Amino acid sequence: MNERVEVFGARRGLTGILTESDAAANANAPTILLTNVGIQTRVGPGRIWVELARRLAASGFPVLRFDLSGMGDSAVRSGGASESERAVLDMRDAMDHLGRKYGAKHFVVIGFCSGTDAAHGVALADPRVAGMIWVEGYAYRTRRFLVRWHMKRLLSLHRWRRYARSQLARLRLTAGQRRSLGEEDLIFTRDYPTRELLSRQLEELLHRGVRILAVYSGADNITYGYSGQFFEMMPGAFRGRVDELFVPEADHLFTTPEHRRALVEQLAGWIEDRFGERPTLRTGT
């Protein structure tokens, strides 16, 4: 295994680790890009990105895991771009660097939780993206989800008791404390594209030949709750065109070693299955 530091981007402000196999790499293999998960560095939760990078490198896929600008070891990017715009610029800087230095032509981008925004944004912006994986990405409630969600709560005495306690506790809060709780909700809430917009964007990517995998854990019990929900929540015909993986026993960050190892194998296996040879992409309309 060969791992080395890469410094690149505007004013050489971005820092990452490139992982490759000591053996001759598959010249047709796309390069995999991994970035931050929330505020965590390029290591990923529980070092999952380190494990995935080494697992994929052993199969001939080069992997760059790097910190987006202003995070980890990467400098703040100057200019007036928004956070999402900066993330796309950072990802494209990584692709440009790997293309110039190593001849990389195609890429698979993986976004975990809020990292989905960067992966999805650069997939739309850059035709060099051949594959995209969301882990705990965009999710929307469906009618089936709501029926299941409400039935579980209506039939649970424990949940009724907890609800009663929470309401009593809230009544004891001052107006300022209640306002503070509302502000915290806003801070930790992400803006999702509408279902209709996301559906059109996915159609655009699929038309271009981009392979897509969406992974969800069972931890999101307020939005996503069953296998196949992806295909019911989107106003488009994506079954058989987008791959979905639902892991009901895992938590949001796949914290336990067995769940993390299983996810690494599932992601690596999907990439091996879909990108054993050079991807064919359509750049026209």
Walk through the language-model features, giving the residues of each.
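Alpha/beta-hydrolase fold nucleophile elbow
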Residues: 98-113
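Glycine-rich "HGGG/HGxG" loop immediately N-terminal to the catalytic nucleophile
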Residues: 66-82
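Short glycine-enriched nucleophile-adjacent loop
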Residues: 111, 116-127, 132
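Active-site nucleophile loop of the alpha/beta-hydrolase fold
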Residues: 112-114, 133-144
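Serine-hydrolase catalytic core
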Residues: 8-9, 50-52, 151-284
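N-terminal cap/lid segment of alpha/beta-hydrolase-fold proteins
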Residues: 1-30, 256
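Alpha/beta-hydrolase active-site loop
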Residues: 80-101
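Short, surface-exposed "cap/lid" segments of acyl-processing enzymes
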Residues: 11, 21-67
